[in-house]
Amino acid sequence: MSFTAYRLPPTARILSLMRIARTTLLAVSLASAVGCRDARSRAAAPTVVVSYAGSLAHPFAAALDEYARRTGVRVVTQSAGSLEAARRITELGDVPDLIALADEDVFASLLVPRHVDRYTVFARNRMVIAYTPSSRHADALDSASWWRTLARPDVEVGRSDPSLDPNGYRTLLVLRLTERQYGEPGLERSVLARSPARNVRPKSSDLVALLQAGALDYAFAYESVARSAGLRWLALPSSIDLGDEARAADYARAAVRVAGASPGDSITVHGAPIHYALAVPLRAPHAAEGERLRDFLLSPIGRRLLTQGGLDVVSAP
């Protein structure tokens, strides 16, 4: 069987092409109109800006997604070390609608009463030593003498910047508590010698990739971060891990000085159990949205999502 190609007469071809052109133009116009409406809809959607500690990135992800899904609010996030996040408010006037920090004392020291009138503690954590299967001398790591492993000359230790991130000054507090408890003069200095400037990052969550890439053998981390990243970690004794509420007085015997609210200022930070807190700043551009998001995070569903994200969430206030 053979087929014969059929060609339209010239006039018919022209009319057919004109119909196709009109149909295409109509489709493009409709798509453009829908796109414009979508763009206008996105622009008109309520917005809430959230600034949070780097160690909250994973726990907050699902909770913020769920809030956006339920409310249609556009959630814009900023992640930084808690001290840096606070100074964006005090020094730059960059005020979010909600701020969540890894140390409640940052609120008390830098933000209350000029920038925040009240804050709510919502989670706890503890310090650990994070590592990977390829970390040097990991087989020798134990909770009774971990610092000796970290102080070996071929070991690379990571930590966060104590002037930007609470994990950084908590690292120093852990070392000072350990030195005091075990009577090991020079312990802090010997461990920090394995953590030169190249191993220091603005926030503790930045150390995860370096550990996974083998650039670091060990890092001072929060337990929640090590768990969510799939890292191995060494649990420290409760006398030094800043995770035991009953040991608050013992932790307070260690102290470090860090930069304050403005250039040239400094504050003294004492050891304390690790508490996360959040607040709506006084000059929040979208304060009502910030309050609604705060209430969602503190609600039973919000707390459940944060717990699933690896946080040790405290009981409702």
Residue ranges and their predicted role:
Residues S2, L8-P9:
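Short polybasic linear motifs
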Residues T11-L17:
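Short, Lys/Arg-enriched N-terminal segments with co-localized hydrophobic residues
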Residues C36-L92, D103, L111-V112, T132-P317:
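Exported/periplasmic ABC-transporter solute-binding proteins
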Residues R22-A33:
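Bacterial N-terminal signal peptides
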Residues S2-F3, S16, S32:
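Serine residues within intrinsically disordered or low-complexity segments
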Residues R124-N125, P273:
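Short, solvent-exposed loop/turn segments at the edges of secondary structure
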Residues L92, P96-D103, F107-V121:
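Short beta-strand-centered segments that line the small-molecule binding cleft or hinge
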